[in-house]
Amino acid sequence: MGSSDGTTTTTTVQEIADATITRLLAAGLIQPKGQKQKRVNWERQISYEYLQRFYPDVPHWTRIEVGPMPPGENSFLYSRTRRWADAVVREPQNMLLIEFKMKAMPDVAAQLLNYKDLLPQTPLFYKYKDLPIKCRVVAALCDDQTSKFIKSQGIELEMFKPMNYEKWYTEKILKK
């Protein structure tokens, strides 16, 4: 190849490939060799934003295990078989169980109803066992059929779009 000063410059295929790979890595479009692409926890973002906006000064727990602990010395081993609720909020008159979904699906209703049964058996929440328990799904997207089903189970549905909604929608729904 000729350069502007009249000298000849040779660029190998390997140099072009290396430069291209460097640009793709810098843009975040590919991952370095041997490194797995990080999985985005979309629900963690929606839960954080929602709780900070609506319950900043209210006692709440996130990613909390619910259910009884088996008695005995090996109870820690069984703790991994317990269920995990996205959030539990202590409201003035009740406990509120929340599941966060970017796209709500019908199975979230069964999930919440199961957690509702397990919450009073959770050691951390024994002192609240006599309070009513409400269930809520907070979702960024939900179709009409799923919405009707969730509500028919006595579960509240609240629509809430977090800051990462457009990115999630593009990657997961439009598959771009």
Residue map of PLM features:
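Charged, terminal alpha-helix-loop-beta segments
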Residues: 2-176
